[in-house]
Amino acid sequence: MPELEQIRCEREQILMDADSSLDHVFFPDSGVVSAVAVYADGSIIEMATIGREGCTAVQAVFGAKISSVRLLVQIPGGAAKMSRAAFMRAIGSMPSFRTLIYAYLQALLEQILVSVACNGAHNLKQRLARWLLMMRDRSDDDTLQITQSLLGEMLGV
């Protein structure tokens, strides 16, 4: 797609903040991005994990123009960046792209539902194991370079 710009994402970089204009969609091709909720006291907790299987800011499909989450780079890597307008044009004019995005939306919803169930039913050690596996699946690297502080925030501890 000609409207994609390749960018480098650095660890703990904020690609988009909550309550900011939803101007771009990011397609990680390496590395991992988390969609996190930001609370009034500044604390955060992870709601979704995005790697090469998907894209950020899919709420644009439903007409959203303001981001409801912070997009935080967990594992550095590359990504393709596309404007929200170009993303919406592609969804409208490319049936195969639209089908892929809808399939990803379904997978993302499943991921969020499993995460909610896991957070309610499992202890911290089990949640950590799930989180590490999700990071490994999306990064193709056995070494995860992440701080204990950020890991604690992602797990809500």
Show where each model-derived region lies.
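Short proline/glycine- and basic residue-enriched helix-capping loop/turn segments at helix->loop/beta transitions
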Residues: M1-R11
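Short loop/turn microsegments at loop-to-beta-strand junctions
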Residues: L4, L22-D23, D142
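Residues that recognize and position ribonucleotide moieties
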Residues: I7, F26, A48, L72, ...
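Cyclic nucleotide-binding regulatory domains
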Residues: Q13-P76
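Alpha-helix/helix-capping structural signal
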Residues: S30, A85-A86, S149
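Cyclic-nucleotide recognition modules
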Residues: A48-Q106, E110, V114
